[in-house]
């Protein structure tokens, strides 16, 4: 009811967004181009949609290239342009990098990660210092000032019936799907859905394979056998994590929900308990022997078709 009362502000927000997009469409706002291919991965809504997972999946698909991920580094405790990692060599802490860029840098030793509010400037620094062959623009759908050679848009089921901010969670109207070159329908393992536009469309599934301990070493699921866990997450959509735990049959005696990008500075695990969270949250809680993250691999239907779509930009 409270968010419905914000509908007049959503109408105003829509006018502002439409005006901004028109300025880009008509060429009144300049779009800058980097000299190597750029693949943008983004979404239409605030909150979790699987962007970070898909970016890491994409980086693995491009293993034969020198990949650099360009990220804003949301809520990081630094400003400007920052090299987070150089092909596996971590340069900064998670606080300086932001949790998502740091997680990608930690789990992807074959790529480089750069954080910058201005992704074009980040790209220029990367070209000077890292010699990448391709950029992946993380959360790039609304960052229209940078040219992209392939524009991939992630959608989750909730997006299709949501409202614009602040009455809902959409950052742009659904009609802006027109700008996407390809669509990825996420969270199919918990909320399967179909969506047809005539654009290349792929379904994304998460396949849960193991646990990670606080050193990010793989641990078998067996440690949870006959145990109840305290689960928690600080994501854009904590409800998705709860659904995953339920679908996997994990016994949860308590679930704690924190805001997205929560820093856990006031969090102390109790001895004798087992805690289960996500990799993004775990990077802020290293050193605890009883805190684990649920790890998964991303699977895409028609992966070969996606590969062909991606590799066309290099020729």
From Swiss-Prot:
For this UniProt record, give its keywords in alphabetical order, as a comma-separated list: ATP-binding, Kinase, Lipid A biosynthesis, Lipid biosynthesis, Lipid metabolism, Nucleotide-binding, Transferase
Pathway connected to this protein = Glycolipid biosynthesis; lipid IV(A) biosynthesis; lipid IV(A) from (3R)-3-hydroxytetradecanoyl-[acyl-carrier-protein] and UDP-N-acetyl-alpha-D-glucosamine: step 6/6
Any one Gene Ontology cellular component term annotated for this protein: plasma membrane
* Annotated ATP binding sites: 45-52
This entry's Gene Ontology molecular function terms read: ATP binding; tetraacyldisaccharide 4'-kinase activity
Listed as disulfide-bonded, the cysteine pairs are none
**Which processes are annotated in GO (biological process)?**
lipid A biosynthetic process; lipopolysaccharide core region biosynthetic process
| Record-listed E.C. numbers | 2.7.1.130
- Report the leader peptide range: none
Q: Kind of enzyme, top EC level?
A: transferase
- Quickly give the catalysed reaction: a lipid A disaccharide + ATP = a lipid IVA + ADP + H(+)
Family under the similarity heading:
Belongs to the LpxK family.
The record's annotation in PANTHER family points to: TETRAACYLDISACCHARIDE 4'-KINASE, TETRAACYLDISACCHARIDE 4'-KINASE, MITOCHONDRIAL-RELATED
Tell me, in a sentence or two, what this protein's role is: Transfers the gamma-phosphate of ATP to the 4'-position of a tetraacyldisaccharide 1-phosphate intermediate (termed DS-1-P) to form tetraacyldisaccharide 1,4'-bis-phosphate (lipid IVA).
How is this protein named in the record?
A: Tetraacyldisaccharide 4'-kinase
Gene name tied to this protein:
lpxK
